[in-house]
């Protein structure tokens, strides 16, 4: 599924024709370029490598500089590979923009969640904790982590305290509310992983054929694009 590299700007709200307010996330998409093309004949599958946001050449090692020169591009900070059905419509150095998406389309977005540091089980796993009564001293403790003789150890994947957040998360079947081509901005319904100015990857949804996703798509009737342009 073809996709783009973007930057999360933040959240706002827009109004549907019936007056319902819906939350949307604004994603800024700088010009994306095709850096490398993989085909089923040479690599076993079809895919394109997309890059975005230029950086100084001195920040890259020579093999990477040569990698970009093959596509006649300056070195780019972010790279992402997207699977495609057919590579014949792409060329090295080709520029990709927000116009590959259209309002009402379903997309998947991948980003890194906000890092929370080392947290306990109540914040990390939403544990209920112990009673808040007087005389109790285990209010926010973990509690039991296993049996005694059998198995005599802590099971793998046991929910315990640890580093919270900063994980790669995919949010599926978000509806594209509007595409502002002149500003390079995509508005999607709902929240997107990560903090403001965080890098996200947008691609056409893998579950668009499911009935639940289709109902979500049909539920929204969007306001005219010219009204959205006044708010962004």
From Swiss-Prot:
Annotated TM spans: none
Record-linked InterPro entries: Ribosomal_uL3, Ribosomal_uL3_bac/org-type, Ribosomal_uL3_CS, Transl_B-barrel_sf
Cross-referenced Pfam families: Ribosomal_L3
A Gene Ontology biological process term: translation
Subunit-structure text: Part of the 50S ribosomal subunit. Forms a cluster with proteins L14 and L19.
Protein family per UniProt: Belongs to the universal ribosomal protein uL3 family.
Name of the protein described by the UniProt record: Large ribosomal subunit protein uL3
């Amino acid at each position: 599924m073809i996709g783009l590299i973007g930057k999360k700007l933040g959240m706002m709200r827009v109004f549907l024709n019936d007056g319902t307010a819906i939350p949307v996330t604004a994603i800024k998409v700088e010009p994306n370029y095709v850096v490398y093309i993989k085909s089923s004949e040479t690599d076993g599958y079809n895919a394109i490598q997309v890059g975005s946001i230029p950086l100084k050449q001195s920040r890259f090692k020579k093999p990477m500089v040569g990698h970009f020169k093959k596509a006649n591009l300056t070195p780019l900070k972010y790279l992402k590979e997207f699977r495609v059905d057919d590579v014949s419509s792409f060329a090295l150095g080709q520029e990709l923009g927000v116009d590959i998406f259209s309002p009402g389309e379903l997309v998947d977005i991948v980003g890194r969640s906000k890092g929370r540091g080392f947290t306990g089980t109540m914040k990390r796993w939403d544990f209920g904790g112990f009673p808040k009564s007087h005389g109790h001293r285990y209010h926010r403790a973990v509690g039991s982590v296993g049996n005694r003789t059998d198995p005599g150890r802590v099971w793998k994947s046991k929910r315990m305290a640890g580093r919270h957040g900063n994980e790669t998360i995919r949010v599926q079947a978000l509806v594209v509310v509007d595409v502002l081509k002149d500003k390079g901005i995509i508005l999607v319904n709902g929240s997107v992983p990560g903090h403001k100015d965080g890098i996200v990857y947008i691609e056409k949804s893998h579950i668009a054929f499911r009935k639940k996703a289709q109902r979500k798509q049909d539920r929204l009737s969007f306001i005219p694009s010219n009204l959205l342009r006044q708010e962004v």
